[in-house]
Amino acid sequence: MGISIGLLELKSIPVGIEAADEMVKAANVQLLTASPTCPGKYIIIVSGNVGAVKSSMNVGLRVAGHYMVGHHIINNVHESLPSAILGVTEVEKIASIGVIETISGLSAVNAGDIAAKAAKVEMLEIRIARGLGGKGFLVFTGEVSSVRSAVKAVANTMG
């Protein structure tokens, strides 16, 4: 069984901190990130098995209430995403580089999963909203044809 990632964006930093705390106490999940982002929002990303992430997200949504801006669960996420989100990816060789910018931080994670599953590319980094005006971007490497295929898959799926 693969891992899942749960993403929650709030428009209150104190409520975001409370939600993150309750989410990790509610289920056996790893907290990948929980931090303020631009413009004045808070993003929480957890990973774990499908059931744990679902339980954790349900608690997060309850705590967030009307402060919730967006949420998403990606089941069976590509194995490279957690390290790319944490910014700790190690690769042996960087070939061609692909960069995709998204309108929101949460959609950058979804785009990364699509790209990594669509072509033989290695995720280098997924940056989520910090210092980006709420946007996100991902950087990956691979052969030219693979990078182009990954970019095309994201464009076709997400628009």
Residue positions per predicted region:
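Short glycine-/aliphatic-rich beta-strand segments at the starts of folded cytosolic domains
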Residues: 1-11, 90-103
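Acidic (E/D-rich), amphipathic helical modules within compact regulatory domains
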Residues: 31-34, 38-77
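C-terminal binding/interaction regions
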Residues: 27-30, 44, 100, 117-159
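The feature marks the first
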Residues: 1-40, 44-47, 51, 109
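Ordered, amphipathic secondary-structure segments that act as subunit-interaction surfaces
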Residues: 57, 63-97, 108
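Short, ordered loop/turn segments at secondary-structure junctions
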Residues: 12-13, 36-39, 49-51, 76-78, ...
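C-terminal low-complexity, charged extensions that often adopt amphipathic alpha-helices
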Residues: 104-110, 114
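Solvent-exposed alpha-helices and their adjacent loops that cap or buttress functional pockets
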Residues: 1-2, 24, 34-38, 65, ...
